[in-house]
A protein has these predicted regions:
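Short, hydrophobic/aromatic-rich segments at coil-to-beta transitions
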Residues: 30-34, 57-61, 126-132, 151-156
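A generic structural motif
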Residues: 36-40, 63-65, 82-84, 134-136, ...
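N-terminal leader/targeting segments and the immediate start of mature chains
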Residues: 8-45, 188-197
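Bacterial N-terminal signal peptides
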Residues: 1-8
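Non-transmembrane domains of secretory- and envelope-associated proteins
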Residues: 125-129, 136-143, 150-197
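Short, surface-exposed coil-to-beta transition loops
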Residues: 47-49, 68, 140-144
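An acidic-aromatic
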Residues: 51-101, 167-168
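Flexible, surface-exposed loop/linker segments and immediately adjacent secondary-structure boundaries
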Residues: 87-129
Length: 197
């Protein structure tokens, strides 16, 4: 479901605002973080943990670690989904697959961020800023996205979707430092079936 960092950066004493949110996000060309994902639907809660690495080049890798073991990766051409339990790697043409998904906030350049999202508000209280965004595409399953910052550190991303789900990613140990995009590739274990779609 849900990838960053390098050009200009928001100075640490500056606050995130409606006016500078996209500039701030675009300044983060790389992201590497662990997360806890909590999905709430009809009062049922599901919690999974994992890691995300993402780049504004549009590439990313999400590793779900507990309780499921699944890796999702994307380069410019394909989406790769490795399910070690099923011993299967699915390869799907990428096309516009992530255009209207929350991962686009972490992998899109500033021009695409402005095309995809409207910033409704950024409210700051006691060093915590919550920004509310809406997708501009009426056909998107995502209805609202909330980004929470502590100071200028991204603390969480929450989205509400048209299926009645609330999905929250709490981030831990965030790094905005550049990394080799080779880290975004999936290494395929022996005995895995590869399925092209």
């Amino acid at each position: 479901m849900l990838s960053l960092l390098l050009t200009t950066t928001v100075v640490s004493n500056e606050t995130i605002s409606k006016e500078n949110l996209f500039d701030f996000l675009h300044s983060k060309q790389y992201l590497k973080t662990s997360f806890t994902q909590t999905t709430l639907v009809d009062l049922n809660e599901r919690v999974v943990s994992g890691n995300i690495q993402a780049s504004r080049s549009g590439n990313f890798k999400i590793e779900y670690l507990d309780p499921i073991q699944e890796t999702i990766s994307a380069d410019k051409e394909f989406l790769y989904k490795l399910d070690t339990e099923l011993e299967q790697l699915d390869i799907v043409p990428r096309e516009e697959y992530f255009r209207n998904t929350p991962i686009s906030i972490l992998i899109s350049n500033i021009e695409n961020l402005k095309k995809l999202y409207s910033i409704n508000s950024c409210i700051e209280e006691n060093l915590i800023t919550v920004c509310s965004l809406s997708t501009k595409d009426e056909n998107s399953f995502v209805e609202k996205i909330f980004l929470q910052f502590v100071g200028t550190e991204l603390d969480s991303l929450t989205y509400l979707d048209s299926f009645g789900q609330s999905v929250n990613f709490d981030f831990d140990n965030i790094s905005w430092e550049p990394f080799s995009e080779n880290q975004l590739y999936i290494s395929i274990p022996e005995g895995i079936d590869v399925v092209y779609h």
